[in-house]
Amino acid sequence: MVDLTDRQLFTPFTHPESGVTSYVLTRKVAPLQQGFYFVNESMSADGRYLWFYCAFPPSGTAHCGRTLGVMDFQTGEVRHYPETQFGEASPFVDGQTGNVYWQNGRGVWK
């Protein structure tokens, strides 16, 4: 189970007007890290892997300039995969295996 209060993994941010608290990954592998679009799962069913978008502004675009990163809660490791550049469609995480699938102009990848 993921412990959102673990400050080595997450930094809480409370919005000053709404009072809503969000938990942001403490360790960075990219200048911009963002969760998947809400219709796609970003975590494996066993809670081990949390996948997210990485971006390195000003390079790339939302059309084809983002790559993937993953937090491994078992090892505590956060990794960036620069070879995973994908198109506009959100990647898909297989909840059972933790594998991720993405597409770009050259095909569908795993």
Regions found by a protein language model. Give the residues of each.
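Acidic surface patches and DE-rich sequence motifs
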Residues: H15, S44, N104
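Residue-level signal for well-ordered, solvent-exposed loop/turn and beta-edge residues enriched
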Residues: V20, R48, G76-E77
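Surface-exposed loop and turn segments in beta-propeller and other repeat-based domains
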Residues: Y23-Q33
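Blade-loop segments of beta-propeller domains
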Residues: L32-N40, F56-V108
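Ligand-binding pocket scaffold of soluble enzyme catalytic domains
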Residues: S42, D46, F52, A62
